[in-house]
């Protein structure tokens, strides 16, 4: 796990994602870079906006990209204004050059949720798995629609939403609690962990306890985001307010890793340091970290 604390975390996250997209070279055996993506809302909204901005400038293309949406509300029309399908097509997919057949969103009107979720998992496998997944985290540590108590090994499935979630949806959508969707189709935590690389955003003081429990506490189903401790290539992108509940020692430690990585790698992306195969670089990195921690 890596943690970076940025003054503009969404800009950092967007640039990191664009680098991954531009580094991808399609081949006969691997035609598409596969993204797992959240909805166009909250902290992710600015990332999508920046992707659109850079696409219009010609700095990034989505022709060789396939996407899998993290979740979708169940039993609402695809044209409903709250549907992920409507929101994502209106604000992102219709603007960039992604091929429609490479956009995958769970069917909100399916009559057989079990079959739909199995087919969704099968489609991910057909593409060779998710290469890069990014998401935000709820103040309770929820990931997609995996709320506290969710199985850490869960797959894509139908999930009843907690009353706290319904109240937040009610406030955000300006509807009564009785009017908001109460069930959703969602990628499971096990499905999410299968992604080759994961980037998670923690923004604002309201996410500080979730960050603390995700990093400094044990892996626990009551904080779903803590499961990211088990992933070998997971990056947490935070602002300073989100670190308020973490110990200063932990924050200094991860800031130190970032600074040393920048010193050693120069213009290389410091987030790529974990992939470095240069033994001398790794030895130098560890020596510097040990000397700083004395």
Spans of model-derived segments:
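N-terminal glycine-/serine-/threonine-rich phosphate-binding loop
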Residues: 1-36, 53, 268, 294
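Short beta-strand segments
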Residues: 37-39, 69, 106-107, 134-137, ...
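A glycine-rich beta-strand to alpha-helix segment
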Residues: 33-43, 47, 123-148, 269-290
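ATP/nucleoside-binding phosphotransfer catalytic cores, i.e., glycine-rich phosphate-binding loops
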Residues: 190, 194-294
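Ligand-binding beta-strand-loop-alpha-helix segment within the catalytic cores
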Residues: 60-134, 254-269, 273-277
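A short secondary-structure junction signal
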Residues: 115-117, 143-149, 154-156, 210-214, ...
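Class I SAM-dependent methyltransferase SAM-binding "motif I" and its flanking Rossmann-like core
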Residues: 144-189
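A glycine- and small-aliphatic-rich helix-loop capping segment at beta-alpha/alpha-beta transitions
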Residues: 49-61, 84-90, 148-158, 217
């Amino acid at each position: 796990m890596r943690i970076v604390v940025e003054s503009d975390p969404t800009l950092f996250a967007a640039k990191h994602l664009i680098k991954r997209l531009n580094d991808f070279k399609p081949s006969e055996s691997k035609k598409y870079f596969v993204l797992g993506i959240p909805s166009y809302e909250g902290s992710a909204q600015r990332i999508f906006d920046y992707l659109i901005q850079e696409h219009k400038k010609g700095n990034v293309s989505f022709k060789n990209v396939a996407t899998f949406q993290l979740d979708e509300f169940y039993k609402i029309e695809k044209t409903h204004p709250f549907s992920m399908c409507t929101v994502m097509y209106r604000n992102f997919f219709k603007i960039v050059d992604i091929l429609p057949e490479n956009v995958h969103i769970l069917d909100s009107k399916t009559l057989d949720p079990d079959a739909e979720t199995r087919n969704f998992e099968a489609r991910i496998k057909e593409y060779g798995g998710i290469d890069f997944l990014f998401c935000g985290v709820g103040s309770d540590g929820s990931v997609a629609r995996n709320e506290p108590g969710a199985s850490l090994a869960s797959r894509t499935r139908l999930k009843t939403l907690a009353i706290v979630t319904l109240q937040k949806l009610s406030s955000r959508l300006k509807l009564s609690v009785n009017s908001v969707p109460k069930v959703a189709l969602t990628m499971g935590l096990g499905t999410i962990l299968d992604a080759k690389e994961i980037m998670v955003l923690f923004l604002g003081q309201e996410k500080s306890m979730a960050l603390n429990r995700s990093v400094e506490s044990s892996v626990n189903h009551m904080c779903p985001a803590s499961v990211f401790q088990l992933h070998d290539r997971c990056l947490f992108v935070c602002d300073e307010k989100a670190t308020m509940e973490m110990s200063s020692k932990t924050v200094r430690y991860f800031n130190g890793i970032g600074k040393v990585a920048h010193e050693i790698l120069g213009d290389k992306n410091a987030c790529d340091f974990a992939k470095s195969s240069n033994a001398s670089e790794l030895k130098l990195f560890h020596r510097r970290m040990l000397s700083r921690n004395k």
